[in-house]
Structures are given as C-alpha cells and as structure tokens.
Amino acid sequence: MECQEFIVLYTHQKMKKSKVWQDGVLKITHLGNKAILYDDKGACLESLFLKCLEVKPGDDLESERYLITVEEAKAVGSRAVEPDGSREALESGSRTLVSSSRSLGCQPSGLKRKATGFQRPYKMPKKVTITENSEPAASLGDENPGPPGPRLLPTFSSTLPLFPTVGQKDLTPVSTDNQSPITFSNRERSDTPLSLPSSYFKINTNTLGKEDKLCFPVSSETKHSDSLLASEPMRRNGLDSHCPGVSQNVRSKAQILALLKSSSTNRKDLHGEIPGHFPKIEPQGCLNIISKPEEDYAETQSIGNLRCEQQSENPTRTTSRWARYLPSQRSPPCSAADENDTEDKPEAQEDVNIFNLSELLQKKSELFETCSKKGELHSEDKPVDNTCQYWNQEDNLAPSFCKNSSVLVSCSSKENASLLSESDIQYSSKVPVNQHEKVWTREGSQGADADAALEPEYRPVSPLPEIGHKQTEVEASLSTSSRISDDIADMGSKSNADREDLKTVHKAVQPFLEVSFNLSNFETSDTDEASQEDSRLSQDSERWEKEAVLTDDSCVQKSCEDIGCREIVGKLPLLSSTDDEPKEALPADGTLLSEFCDRTCVGFNSGPHGDVKTGKALEGQCHSDTGSSLDSSLEWSEDVAGDSREDASQSIQGNAINCGGVSPSKKPRGVNRSLYSPYLLTAVTDPAPENSDLLSEARKSPAIEVSRALLECPCEHRASQQPVEFQGHQVKGSATSGVMVRGHSLQRGCTQFPDSIDYENFLTDTCVWTPGLPSTYGQTDFLQVISPEQKIPALSPAPTFSFNTRNEDTVLELSEESLKTRTLPGLKTIGFQDSKNLQRFPFLSGASAPFATLPADDGPAVLDPCSFMIDDDAREPSGSSMLNLCEESGLSFDLGLEGQGGTPGGVSLLPKSSTQSKWLKYQNPPQCNSTAPNRLASEVTEGLFAEAVSGLHFSHTSESESSVDPVRLQMIKGLLHQQQQDLVSRKQAFSLTLNQTCKTQEHETVLGSSASKNCRAKDLQEINNSDLCFPNGQKIISAYLPQRQVHIPAVFQSPAHYRQVFTASIIEHLNILLFELAQRLYKALSKVDISFYTSSKGETMRSGKNNSPSCHHNQPAKLVMVKKEGPNKGRLFYTCDKSKDNQCKFFKWLEEVTPGQLPQNTSQSTMVFNDIKSIGSYLRSQKVPVYEECQLLLRRGFDFQRKQCGKLKKLTTVNPDFYSETKSKIYLKLSRRESSSVYSKGDLWVISKTLDFELDTFIACSAFFGPSSVNEVELLPLKGYFPSNWPTNITVHALLVCNASTELTTLQNIQDYFNPAALPLMPYLLAMSQSATVSSKNISKRKFIPPAITSIKTKTELHLGATLQLARELINVHRLNKDQATALIQIAQMMASQGSDEDALEPFGHSLPITVIHGVFGAGKSYLLAVVILFLVELFEKCDSGTVGNARPWKVLVSSSTNVAVDRVLLGLLSLGFEKFIRVGSVRKIAKPVLPYSLHAGSDNESEQLKELNALLKEELTPIERVYVRKSIEQHKLGTNRVLLKQVRVVGVTCAACAFPCLNDLKFPVVVLDECSQMTEPASLLPIARFQCEKLILVGDPKQLPPTIQGSDAAHENGLEQTLFDRLCLMGHKPVLLRTQYRCHPAISAIANDLFYEGSLVNGISERERSPVLEWLPTLCFYNVTGAEQVERENSFVNVAEATFTLKLIQSLMASGVESCMIGVITLYKSQMYKICNLLSAVDVGHPDVKAVQVSTVDAFQGAEKEITILSCVRTRQVGFIDSEKRMNVALTRGRRHLLIVGSLSCLRKNRLWGRVIQHCEGREDGLQHASQCEPQLDHLLKDYLEKQAEEKQKKKEKEKSKDKSH
C-alpha cells in the first residue's frame, strides 16, 4: 500500500467551542494503521494510530493533542497546501522522515572529532621525525615488510600527529588498546623503524600531542637522546617544542656526556625532563611522575596503547623478521643473545657496581651517539661497529628483557634495578605457561614481523619451556644488562631500523613482561578477552608488554635521565628490546598493566617505574638497605638468570628474579619473592624468611645492590605488584610511574616477605595495597601472607603518604635516605612505621609514595579527610584502599590508554572495564584479607586511595587535563569499578579460588564492602580535592553511567567520619549528574563536525561556507530548533536568516543536508557547523541545556551601608564582611532566556571558555531564583574558579545542569552544624551510646564538651514518675491503643532522662534520647504524633516554670520531607483543639486550614506574602477555604505570626525550609520527624543539626517507599537511599511497632499482612465499618484486561486497553452516585497516568467534578487514602519494577473500602508477589473478573445514567418553558 497524503485541517483547541484551524498534511504509512500529522511548514506534529484502515475526505480524526479534519487527498508529487515556498517546505518536510532516517542511519554513532580526547589539537613535529627518520622509516618499512607497518605508516603519516589511535583503529582489528599501539608502531615505522619503541612511546605521547616528539627520539637514538635531554624540559613545557627539538637536537658526544653527567647530578630534574620523554616510551613508568605527570603520563599511556596495538599488528606482519631477532634475543640458543648477554654481563655488573646512572648513561650515550654518527641507527640487523654491534646485540637481546633491564638498572641504578627485578618477576611470571604463551604473543606483537613469527612460535611452545627460554635469555640479558644499556644507547644511535628491530625484539621481549601478565593469567585471559581472543590476547599481551616496556623505559628513563638523555632515548627503545627480559618483565607488567595489568600488571610496572623515577633516592635507599631483601633479591635474581631456567619452569618467580637479581645464591628465594607475584607470593609465603634474607643480602651488596635493590624492589613490587600490577597499571594511568610503583612496591614487599619483618614493613609501606593486588592475582599464599600482613602492618601510613606525596615533585625530591627508608618525604612526614621498617621496604615505600604522588593531586586532600579512618584501620584499610585504588586506577588507566591511543574513549572503556572487572574480582579477595580487621575504616581509606589514584590516572589518560580528567576518571572509574564489581560478583568462585586464604564469606563481604569503600574513598577524595567534577574529553561517551558506590555504615567513628562519608555521597551523586550531562554533551559533539571551532588555524572555515545550505535569497540559512510541543520538538532545521518581513519560505531539516554540501574530509553522515550558534542549537536539540556565548561579569560589591549612614563609618570596621563587601560578585549574562520555571535558586552551572568544555571550566551555583530583568544570574563558584583566570566581560559558554538546592543545602548544613559543639545529639547519631558509653573512650570524649555548651542545655526538673503520670493521663483521654501507648511511654521516659549527655553515661539509668516508631499503613501515626506534641507541650510548661539561668526554653519542631506530612500532624493538632503553633513554609503549599497559622518562609518582605495570599483569593476556593485565606491575610498584615514564631512551643516546617532566615535564631531541643523512611539522612539532618536537637522522635514505615534520588542509581542498598530510620535500626535501636491499622477493609489489609508484614498486622477496623460504597462493587477485585503494553518516552509504559477500561470504571462509579473525591487511580507508570488524565479530560461524563478524581503514581500517593482505589498495572509482557515489595505495599494499601486492580492476568500470575495477590482476589466473591464480561454491565449502568440525565434535562426544559408561558 503506497503512502497516502491528505490535506487536512487540525486544531489543538479540542475543548473550545470556537476553534482555530490550521492547514496541515496527514501522511498514512504503508501499513495503513498509522498516520503522521505535519504542519504547513513540514514539521512533524504528532503520530496517531488509526482505528479504521481507510481514511477518506471528510473524516474526523482525533489524536492525543489534535482534532483533525480530512479535506482532500493530496496528489502524488503535488505541492503542499500553499502555492509557493511553503509548499516546498511542506514537501521537503514530507520527505524529511525518510531522508533524515536515511542520513541518520548512515551516521556513524561513534564518530569522533578530530581533536578527540585532546585538550587541543597538537601539531606534531611529525615532519621532523620523518625527516630524521626518513631513512629509518624506509628501512623500517623494508625491514618490517609486514603490511601493518607500511599501511599504518601512510595512515599515520596522514593522521599520525593528532590521531595515532584513530589511524590504528582503522589499521588494526585489535581491541582499541591494541589498535592504538599498532597505530603507534606504524607511526614509528613510518617515522623510523628503530625509533619504533621510543617512537612508539612517543606516538602514544603524541596521541596526547607529544607523539612526534616520541617518534623523534625513536627515529634517531643518538639524536633522540640528545634531543631528549634538551627537549625533555621543552616537552615538559610543550609537546610541540619537544618534537622539533628532537629533530634539531643532535648533540655531540661531549654534549651528550655533559648532559648525562648533569642528568645524573640532577637526577630529579632529568627525571622531570627525561621522564617526559620516557613516559612517552614508558607511559606507565616514571615519565609521568617525573615530568609533567599529566602530560607525560598521558603520553606514555597513549604510547602504551599505540604500542599494544602495534605489537598486535607487528607480530603478524613482522614475525619472521622479528623472529630472527627475537630468537637470538629471547632464546638462549641465540648466539647474538648469548654474546650480548656475555658482553652485557660485565657491563651490567660494571653498571651495577658503578650504579652510576651518569656513567652508564654516558656509556650508552656514547654508544648511541657513535651509532647515530655512523648512521648505523638505520641498520636493523648489522651493527656497524662494536657500539653498533652492541646495539644490535641489544636489539637481539631485547627479547631478553633482563639485559635491557639490567642496563636500565645500572643506568637508573635503583630505578633500573627495580625495573629489572620487576621485569624479571614479570618475566618469570611470563614463564608460567599461560603467561608465557601470551608473553610470546606479546613479544610477537611488539616485535612486528619477528614478533608475529615469534607469536606463533611461542604459542606452540609450551608455556613453561617458553618461560624457561625467556628466563635463560633474561639471565643472559641480565648478565649483559650493563652492556646492553650501553648497547642500547649505541643501538639507538645506530639506526632507526635497528631500533625498530629492537623494538620488535623489545616487543617480543615484552612478552616477558607478559609473564607478569601471565601471573595474572586468569586475569590476562579476561583482559585479553576484552580486546580479543588468543591472537588478540597475544596482541594484547604484546601491547601490554609494549606498555610495560614503555613503563620500563620510563623507569629507565628515570635513571637514565640522570645518565644521559641520548642514551636513555636510545636505551628506551633498546631497553624495550635490549632490556627486553627485565623490561619485558616490566613491559609485561606494563603491558599487563596497560592491557591486562591495566587491571593488574600495569600497577606492578608502575611501582617499579615510580621507584625508578625516584631513582637516586631509591638508589640511596637500596644502598642503605643493602642488607635488606631488595639487594639480595637483585643479587639472586641475576644469578637465577643463569641458573633459573630449570628453576624457571619450577619457579617462574625465581626466573624473573634471576633476570633482575645479581646474587645467584639467593636467586631461588629472590626469584620467588621478586618474580612472579602470584607464584612469588606462594613461594614467598613459604620461604618468607629466605626472602627477608635475600632482601638483607641485596642490601648488603651496594654496587649490584643498587641495581639489585632496584630490581629487587621492583621484584618485590612485582611479587605483590603482579597482583598489584592491575592496580599499578591503573595507577599507571594516573601517575605513570611514581604512583604505580609505590602501590605496587608495597604490595611486592608483602609478596616477597609474607612471613618476614621486611614483608611486614613492606606491607606497612604497601599498606593494604600490596595484599590487595596479590589477592587480585589470585596468589593464595601471597594473599594469605599479605592479608595477615596487611592487617598487621600500619598500612594506613603508606596510603596517607601516598595521598600526601602524590606530587611528582615529592617523588623527585625524595632523598636517598628517604628512598632507603622506602618512603617519600611526604611519607616520612605522614609518618610511616619506623624508618628502618620502611627501609626494609624502600621500594614498597617508594612505590607507595609514588602511588601517593599520583593521587597526591587529588589524593592528599582525601588522605587528610580520611586520615583518621586510615589510622583506625590503617593496615587493613590501606590494603583495601590499595586494592580498590588499583582496581579503580586500572579502570581509569584503561580508559586513559584508550583515549590516548586515539581510540574512542567509550570503546576502550568498555573492553577495559570488562578486564578491569576481572581484576576487581582479584582485588576484592585481597581486600577481604585486609578488610577483616577494620572494614569500615579500611573501606573509607580504600575508597580514598582508589579515588586519588584513579583521578590521577584519568587526568593522565585524558591528555594532561588533570583537573577535569581526574574527575572524569573517577567517574569512569566508578563505572568501571561497578562493572568490575559485577564481574567480581559473577566470578566470585574464581576469585575465591585464587584467594584460597580468604574465606568465602570474608571474600564476598570484602568484595561488596571494598567496592563501596573504594567508592566512598573516591568520593571523599573528590570532595576533598576537587569537590564537584565535570568530566571532559570523549572517553566517557561510551562509558556506562556510574552508580553511586559510597557505602554508608551503620556506625561512625567520629563526627569527621560522618561528615566525610555523607559529603562524599552527596558529591558523588552530583558528580554522576555532571557525568551524565557531560556524556550527552560529548556524544552530541562526536556526531558532528565542529573542526572550524576546534582547529587553531580555522582551516576548515572555507569549507564551512558549504556547511549550511543557501535559502532562496542565496544567503546561508540559519539553524533553528523546533520549540513547539510535538514529535519534532528539539529537531533542527535550516530556514531563512532574514527578518520576518523579508524571510523566504526556505525550509530544510538538518539531517537532509546533502553529502555534497559536507566537507570532503568528513564522513557523509557527519553534520558540519560553521558557527557557534548553530552548535548551540544542535546541542539543545540533543537535550544539552547549553547557553553559548554568554558574558561573565565581575562586579565589586557596593558599600550601601557606608553610603547611607556616613556617620556610622566606624561600623564598617566592626564587621567589614557585612558593611564593606570587597569580594567581587560573579554574574553570568545569558545569551537567551527560557521560561522562569526553568530557573531556581541553587541551580548547578558549568562555565567554560570553550564550547566543548574541555579547558578552563568551573562549576558554580545560582545565588537567586532566576535571571534578572537583564538576563543576569549571580553565581557562587563551587569548584575550579580562580579569579586570575576569569577576567570580567569574557565570553563564556554555560551548561545548566540541574537544580541542586537540596544537595547544596544539605552539604552546607553538614559542614556548618554537624559538630559536637552545636549538636548535643551527635554521639547518639554516630553509634549506640547505650553500650558505647560504658567505655572510658566515650566518656573521655564527653569531657571535651565545653562548659559553655553544656550550660545552654535545656534542663527539666520533672522526675520520671511525674512524666509517666502525665503520659498515662493522655493515653486515657485520647484512647490510644496498646502500641501507641507504648510509644508515648517510651517518649516520656526519654524526656525524663535529663542530662542526656552526662546521665546517659550511666548505661542503664535512662533511655536513649532517640525514639524510633515504626507505624504500618493507617496505624494512626499522625494522630499519635499530635497526642505526643500535646504531651510535650504540657511537659514543657511544667518544666520551664522552674528553669533558671540560661537554660533554653523547650520547643518542639515538627518536620518532614513533604508539606502534606507536616500539615497532617498540624491538622491533627487542630482537631484536638490545639492552635498554638506556627507553620513556616510556602503559602501555596500549605493546607488551607493551616494557613492562618502560617508564616511565609521564603522572604522577609511582607508585601510579597500578602500578594500571594491575595492571589489565592482569586482562585477557585470553597467557602471555608476563603475564610482561612482571609484570616491568614489579617494575621500577616498584623505581623502576629512573625512575633508568635519566637513564642510558640510548636513549629511545623519541611526539611527544605529549615534553612530559611526567619528560623535563624531558634533552637528546638525536641525534633519530631514524620515519614522519616521517605527522607534521606542528609535531609533528615537539616532540622536535627540546625536547631541543636537533644531529643529525637522518628516515625516512619521502612516497608513503604524509600526516598527517591533522581539522576543517579545506587550500586547497593547502603547508599543515600539508606534513611536515618534504617541506619538507627541497623545500629541497634529497637523501634516501637504500631501494628494496628485503621484504614483498609480487612480483606485488603490481609494482602499486605500476608505479603509484607509477616502476619503481624492487627485490624483496628471491622468489615461492617468498611461496608461497600455500592452494592454491586466488590471490595477486592482483579479485572483481567487483555491489552498490550507500549513503550513511551523515558522508558515509561502505557496500556491503552487498561486506560480505557479504567475510564469506563470511573464513569460507571460516578454514574452510580459515587463522588469523584472518593475515587483514586494509582498507576505504576507516569505515561499511563498521563493517558488516563487525558481520557478523563476529553470525555464529558456529565459529571461536573470529574476532574476531582485523583490520578497519580505510587510515589505521589504515599500517605494518601481514598474510599475506592483503582490500580492500573500496565505491564503485559514482563513485570518489571512493579514487583517491588515497597512499591506494591503502598499501591495496595491506599483504599479504605475498595481495591480494584486492573491488569493482565496471564502476565502477573507468573510473578510471585502478584500471584499471591491474585490468589487473595480469587478467594473473594466476584474477586476475579474479566473486563470483557464486566463491560456490558458497566455500559448498562452508563446507559441508564445517561438516560436519566436526558430525562432530567428534558424536565428542566419543560419547566422553563412552562415558566416562560406563565409569564
């Protein structure tokens, strides 16, 4: 059937007699059952379903909004109704749907802007890199014939500088991360083959905007190193500068040596600079920490991602070539590798002995320089000279990462050692079959062609053999490590090709890193799963390896930085390859960290890297701790390298350690300890003492010790880091090296020394972090060891330190001694355990410190707020927090990596989150252990750490946007964390298996609590550090909306704890709202091209002219949004930009812009905008409330007081804040204005200088209710506002987030009033003082209450006997039932127990000052409260008569969350004859009978109140209501209520109105909260804290609806939804149960009694008293309606059949004489409510009061009751949320006499709860009926009614006629 079109007339004025009709077009779809109405402009107005399939001219149709008259059929192809332009518009409009849908379909949803994820589009000095590496690039292409290289190269060449990730995406099918690495590698290749590793890193960095720079160093090792040194600082300053610097900075040997010397001398500075470069190489490693943490880190992350992608790509294409290198490097058989090892061994030893990073670097730089000079840099395979050979060897050796690691270690000394041991550990980890396989794969991926070959080779090979081989290689490389370092320098200079080979080899070696990943093998597979399967896994592993390598490089860089930039640069790539084993181990860690370790291994890498960054200090630490396990670990690690191949298979851990360590004798122990975290944990657990010995040994030998210490520390870190790696990686994300190292180090320490004191110390430094990671890895032994250790050591100090020491500077500033102590200065300041103990865990401390350093930006604040918590649960909490941190960090890092890689943030987030979830699974088990002692405190601490770390990660990940990124990271982390938690819960069995030590219950508890703890800590961190956070960047586009994770405990440890937790929970909620808006914003921006705006040069402006079509005047059309209600509301269309008089009829939907009109460089489906207004209109159409091009105005406050009262100038000095306001006020002049209802006081605004809200953004709230007459809104900054950054009259863009007045008010209330001095009730809100008061601790607290505070307490002179006597009198007078009497007696006892603060200390002398009353529905709660208030008033009058001194008068405050609830109690007082109260609130919201006793709360202006009251008089009121309003006007004119407010003893006010100024000076010792189960605890605290409450009465029903928190969902039941009522019950309060219900017919109450109250209900009403309203109407009935549910907007449902039957039921009831006010309709969905309301308003029932029928949702009906209740269930397919017990309880208990349920019998009967409801109905007579059977009876009733109505009308007419005739 063809689509038919009809010319119609339509009107929206359905009910008016004289209607205004408009022209339109009605299109009938091809199915014939649906029609779409368009106006004459072609705008789609509404769609309607047709009852008759045939539409003819003359038909009258009715839709939901319009009446439609069909005039004539429209001829096909004819113009529209109007002759000219408008017809065109109509026609185009008619085509709009099809074309727009077509275009939308083509539109790639994930399309990203060019500057995706970048703060600004950085122009990469790619050309320079290409120029330098032109030869190498060519050679690379040749050497790496694999298609990926060449293909990627061109792709990258075109988009490399800005979008390496994007290019990678296209090039590689690997996961986002993988793709990113691939892209990077391609770039490197294109830029320079050898520079691939560095370039690789660089590219990642470049992804941030430093990619070119990285490439440069990579391309020419020598040049790069020089440029690195010189340009590293530049890089810190700017990525761009670095890139050019690289190309230009070719230093001579002497220069490089000088630089190296200076670097070694100023290691910190070098690290700062070089790390920037290295971070590119090792995004996870030191780079971030040392240099700009954010930029470098971001770069490194990007690099890591690119690398990973590259690796995956390279393995396939470069396998053969790389295999050549890899076999030599990786396999001990390789002669090259062996030679290198042999040669490197002495060098390595030399380096180790020297442990002079400068010398090492010098050597390496010399080699590198030589190679560069000789132009051998470009030769991959053949070394030109010895130096070149070394380089080549290094390349070959690169597979044996140990070598490179050793070199690195020697270079970085401590740092390198850490790297080595870490890499070794990882390597050994890789040795395990699972890991090894993946490791090899990874290597293959990294190694490009060779890697690809290796990947297949390794895959076939059994993991153990591979591991052994790797270990062997590692040993060799370790032995040659020092030489390798030099070689690396040489190689770097040798040739880019060599470097590329090295890179590939490095990548291959990185699989060693993958070993670490393998440690997390299970996780690895999970992580890999996220990206791909085995090959994918291998690629991922490779990526991870690469990332690990990057990390390694950054670590190396740290140390190397001191030695020399050039060498480091060359070394980094080479290190990646040459130090392949150690590095690989590290890279594996890094790789794992980035991919798998993103969740796991990464953390591990980070730890060592962090240590490396603090190379000198760490080195010093290592030396001082020569005797400690670190050195020994290093020593035996090296030895193990030689001997541990067999051991490798036996103990992968040992192998890894061997690679990293020097002493053979201790290698077995060391291996276990340093190597494989999971295995190592096991091994370490058993040989814990040995481990400690090893550590001590390591400390004993200084030369090797330094490197060993570094290695061992990393090893230790690894051991714990392996599990920690996941965290570390995440941490890595935040603070590439430093942070990660710390966290991991601590964990490693635990791993290595589970049973040893060193282990303990490590744990202490590690805090709980270490244990958590091992658990994550699933090392049962380690976990076991760790869990006890974690519990034992004071982990909190480490976490505290980490928070304090988040700063890079802190890490750099670490002194050798501090490193020795294994604590950063910050840590020391915080005060870790004994410095000696710390020394035992220098790396752990270091790791923990760097970790802290990363979070330092956000973490320190968090730390401080949560410090008390950390102290309480120091060890356990720390562990938990570390785990959580890792978890969260990992998530963040993953996100960051993806973003950096250039892949869409969302895409990367999703896979990573899944992987992370797995890691979370592991993390949770460790948390169990650590959580055991103090879960609460630990949870808080965990959360804090996690949040801090994750925040840093996020910032790094998000490309140096630390301030916003941390928030977004935290938000994403929250999401990922939730996902992880989900995974954890799903895979609990697996995690439990991993954590054998943890009991199942403990594990589960930890999982839940740790998650919540993490979230809480995160939130605390956000609150303390950044408060509100608006995420920037597009990484969040595809992320899931976070859920609230903050866990609110039943008991609090202190007021500070209470404030922190609730502040965190509220901030978390607001941040989720901000996240959701940011997600909408970036999703909308990702679908369009705004390159004209984001481009610095505006090159696309030329094409912008073509973006918008031309109107009939040949002028660019303007973009306008549809504002009228209807289906097209919010759609954008082009129209003429002329004035109305000259406007042509041009019209075109935005989606209809033809592809030819779009710029060539954009996809056809992308809409292009060339002006900001169009972007703003588009964003608003996407439900983003943006105000573009507003003005930010700053004005000084005027001193009105001084001007008006010149003689009182002295007063200005008395209170200058009040009399002379010097602060500037901020005003936002809006560019447009909505209706006044859109704005309110407390609106949340986000202000930015850029329309993409990426840079220079702050959050503020509105100070008043709306814009002024000149569209100005006064703003109060909340977060991110710095006056120097925001000059006046600047153009800004604004987002109106939501109204947050409640949240902001509660936050302010908690901060201002919740303190012991102002809240006497506080101790009882924190914990059960009844039992706690017995402790001396509690008593001592009370002693600190100042006398001035206790003296103002109210005092009663009444004895308990007199109070109880008064209560009994009232019980008799008001006939209270037994339960009500019990409640009143308990209140009387509470009031008699005076001196609540002192006397309550007597445990059994008096009752608690809190009474909790649980009243079921209809239990007379409001009546009971009225009687209680009468009792209190009489009591007050008696006791106040004898008060003396400054005792406060007794007053009672009646409060609730709703006006109805407050008025209900006051109406009860009126019914009892009590009128001495004042109701404070809004005039329009107060019940009319209470109005005469009201006081307007909003303003002190009497005239405004009178205006409101006079306006009420003009409305439709009943006579009695008019009396109330007139009386109220009189009271207001006289001002009596304002005076009475300070005199009366009873005041009623809602919680929200408690902050109004008229209540400022009042104190209410007694507070009554009604409907408390519907109020959040922060809202409940408004009346409690503000008015210095001493006695509290809570009334509610927790079995009814909980508070609704709009905008965010909770991940558990202990968040903001947990009310004060719930928490007090959990705390131990026993509520008084009011069991007697007086509302419902016994048949109705029987349902609730059976389903929800376990048979405890008592009926206070008989069936006779609830007789039917109509004889034919059943008391309880289920009407089965056969209808179909339909999904409406906002995922709400409609059932038209049920709505129609409900309407007929209402009509029948009213026709039978039932008053409309007796009928209530409850629907479970809003859309159904609107549908029924529309039907009621549209149908003329002939009853004037039809509108009085109350139709509302369950939420709005709570507290109300009706004689007849009709319940519409709506759903027909699935029950959905309507089976919520609390929701059902409310819905079923609103009717007093009749409950009529309308629903689908077949659907609801399947549900457990609804099935039982139906059973109850079936048990009644006529309890189950079918609508089809009932309708005839109802129709008959209606017919009779209508006939009677007609007769009456006829009679009236006849009477009138007869009267007329008589006249």
UniProtKB/Swiss-Prot annotation:
Known catalytic reactions: ATP + H2O = ADP + phosphate + H(+); Couples ATP hydrolysis with the unwinding of duplex DNA at the replication fork by translocating in the 5'-3' direction. This creates two antiparallel DNA single strands (ssDNA). The leading ssDNA polymer is the template for DNA polymerase III holoenzyme which synthesizes a continuous strand
Pfam families according to UniProt: AAA_11, AAA_12, ZGRF1-like_N, Zn_ribbon_GRF
Bias (Basic and acidic residues): 81-90, 533-545
Signal peptide feature range: none
Polar residues composition-biased segments: 173-185, 300-321
Superkingdom in the source lineage: Eukaryota
Any one GO MF annotation of this record: hydrolase activity
Subcellular location: Nucleus
Residues given in the record as Zn(2+) binding sites: 1111, 1113, 1136, 1144
Keywords associated with the record: ATP-binding, DNA damage, DNA repair, Helicase, Hydrolase, Isomerase, Metal-binding, Nucleotide-binding, Nucleus, Phosphoprotein, Zinc, Zinc-finger
Residue spans of biased composition, Low complexity class: 92-105
GO cellular component annotations of the record: nucleus
Keyword Cell membrane: no
Enzyme class label: isomerase
Enzyme Commission (EC) number: 5.6.2.3
Subunit field text: Interacts with DNA repair protein RAD51; the interaction promotes RAD51 strand exchange activity. Also interacts with DNA repair proteins EXO1 and BRCA1; the interactions are increased following DNA damage induction.
PANTHER family: PROTEIN ZGRF1, ZINC FINGER GRF-TYPE CONTAINING 1
Summary of the function given for this chain in its UniProt record: 5'-3' DNA helicase which is recruited to sites of DNA damage and promotes repair of replication-blocking DNA lesions through stimulation of homologous recombination (HR). Promotes HR by directly stimulating RAD51-mediated strand exchange activity. Not required to load RAD51 at sites of DNA damage but promotes recombinational repair after RAD51 recruitment. Also promotes HR by positively regulating EXO1-mediated DNA end resection of DNA double-strand breaks. Required for recruitment of replication protein RPA2 to DNA damage sites.
Record's protein name: 5'-3' DNA helicase ZGRF1
Species of the source: Mus musculus
Protein's gene: Zgrf1
